[in-house]
């Protein structure tokens, strides 16, 4: 980044997305005792991860789990599956985990919406009744993910403000061409612009889906 004075990074922090996913899960668990179906005082969960060793995947998972624990949720990890951010792979991995753990699974944390939707696909393919579904949570706020939240299939997601990032990149590019840097943009370490994630539930999913610039 320091090799060229006009090189900048615009994006979001993976840690924040994991923290917010954990907060969504904790809020739901505290507000709805039915999540803990076997009433053993702890939440049995599985994780669907992106590609092995990927920094965002590791950070999202660690921070989601740590946030749940910091909110007083006792956890038991049953399993995890690597699905490379892919819906079809997530369906296959989830079917394997259902085969191993059946109705023990109470929470599915997916590193992105596509994998969360793949997990839901697995339950549907196995003809498991929705009343026996665990809680599913994703990250990114894709159109498909937002629609699943609106349909109450996905309990929540964490919205990656790609429209805000695109606007920031366009504004920065125009300024750099004119030989200046916008004074109203916040930079970290001089070269990094981070746009915040935000939590999405059924209460605001439609608003996110209809966001200008999509």
Task: Give the ranges of each region predicted by the language model.
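Hinge/cleft segment of the Venus flytrap/periplasmic-binding protein
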Residues: 42-52, 56, 67, 164-214
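Active-site-proximal beta-strand/loop segments in catalytic clefts of secreted hydrolases
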Residues: 1, 12-13, 48-51, 80-84, ...
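Sec-exported extracytoplasmic/periplasmic mature domains
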Residues: 23-31, 65, 69-73, 95-103, ...
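Extracytoplasmic ligand-binding site segments that recognize negatively charged/polar headgroups
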Residues: 12-22, 43-67, 76, 83, ...
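Hydrophobic alpha-helical segments within soluble ligand-binding/sensing domains
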Residues: 10-42, 90-91, 141-145, 161-180
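Loop/turn elements at helix/coil->beta-strand transitions in domains of secreted/extracellular proteins
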Residues: 4-6, 42-44, 70-77, 102-106, ...
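Hydrophobic alpha-helical
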Residues: 63-64, 76-148
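Exported/periplasmic ABC-transporter solute-binding proteins
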Residues: 121-163, 167, 171-187, 194
């Amino acid at each position: 980044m320091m090799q060229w004075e006009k090189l900048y990074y615009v994006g979001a922090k993976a840690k924040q997305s994991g923290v917010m996913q954990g907060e969504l899960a904790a809020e739901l668990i505290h507000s709805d005792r039915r999540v803990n179906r076997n009433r053993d005082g702890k939440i049995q969960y599985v994780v669907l991860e992106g590609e092995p060793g990927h920094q965002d995947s590791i950070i999202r998972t660690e921070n989601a789990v740590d946030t749940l624990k910091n909110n007083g949720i006792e956890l038991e990890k049953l399993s995890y599956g690597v699905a490379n951010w892919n819906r079809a792979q997530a369906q296959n991995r989830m079917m394997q985990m259902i085969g191993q753990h059946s109705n023990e699974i109470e929470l599915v944390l997916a590193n992105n919406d596509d994998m969360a939707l793949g997990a839901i696909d697995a339950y549907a393919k196995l003809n498991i009744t929705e009343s026996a579904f665990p809680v599913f949570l994703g990250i990114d706020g894709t159109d498909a993910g937002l629609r699943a939240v609106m349909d109450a299939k996905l309990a929540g997601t964490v919205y990656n403000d790609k429209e805000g990032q695109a606007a920031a990149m366009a504004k920065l590019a125009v300024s750099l061409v004119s030989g200046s840097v916008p004074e109203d943009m916040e930079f970290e370490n001089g070269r990094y612009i981070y746009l915040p994630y935000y939590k999405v539930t059924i209460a605001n999913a439609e608003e996110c889906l209809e966001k200008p610039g999509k």
